[in-house]
Amino acid sequence: MSKLLVFGHQNPDTDAIASSYAFDYLAKKAFDLDTEVVALGDPNEETAFALDYFGVSAPRVVTSAKAEGASHVILTDHNEFPQSISDIREVEVYGIVDHHRVANFETANPLYMRVEPVGSASSIVYRLFKENRVDVPKDIAGMLLSGLISDTLLLKSPTTHASDHRVAAELAELAGVKLEEYGMAMLKAGTNLASKSEAELIDIDAKTFELNGNAVRVAQVNTVDIAEVLERKEAIEAAIREVMASEGYSDFVLMITDIVNSNSEILALGANMDKVEAAFSFKLEDNHAFLAGAVSRKKQVVPQLTESFGA
């Protein structure tokens, strides 16, 4: 077998980078695999903060597994092929570590697959370290903690599993940081949107979902001031229309999430706005609506859209 590439999803967030970085280390130590961690995009500002804080180099970015001479890959923090590497259907998926729904995915051969309904893929990777009795180095503990903090908004998201609180406490101790202090600093580092173009803003954390034959793009940005983001609404909508036309998305849903007050504004465009409105029981006005208490794409947006589009 050629070298195994380990990577998270496209437009990688902190959990995608952290879980793949840590699993690459574990694969070598516990399973004697010849792996290399790579990424399907550059780290965002939140992830860059974590990488810099713990002295970790960002994984190199690749666009094709076969171009790297790899015939087998390991996926972390995703399993759906539309969210993965461009030639995912041309290589063999050796393993998966994920905490999302399983969909748009199939393999010709059996594989190692660890999927749990917890707050982050990083939580699962940490558990794998413990199960295989592999010590967690400080930098890896820090990155795994960062992935968990990011995906659960410092354990405030409804996706947070009861076990995640213990995991976060243990990782914070191993990483030598104060959980709340480090967590808020990292999350705030990811809310600097002023320097982003509208095209960059809608692509910071975006995933494509195949919903009943529709390619639906669901993006999320975190902020401490929703009104400031909505001041750019017209330009954001223009960027959304442009990417919908170029990429063939039927619909685009942008979550603008207030990480302080735990609410989101939904900005949506596309061919199926009736289904979007039905999903959340709201009425879009000028393409947007307020969604109280919504902070999680995985639990509070995608399942609702999936049900509505499937109806």
UniProtKB/Swiss-Prot annotation:
Its cofactor is Mn(2+). It is an enzyme of class 3 (hydrolase). Its main location: cytoplasm. Binds 2 manganese ions per subunit. Mn(2+) 1 binds at H9, D13, D77. It catalyses: diphosphate + H2O = 2 phosphate + H(+). GO terms for cellular component: cytoplasm. SUPFAM superfamilies: DHH phosphoesterases. The keyword Manganese applies. Pfam families: DHH, DHHA2. One of its GO terms (molecular function) is manganese ion binding. Belongs to the PPase class C family. This is Probable manganese-dependent inorganic pyrophosphatase. The lineage of its organism: Bacteria, Bacillati, Bacillota, Bacilli, Lactobacillales.
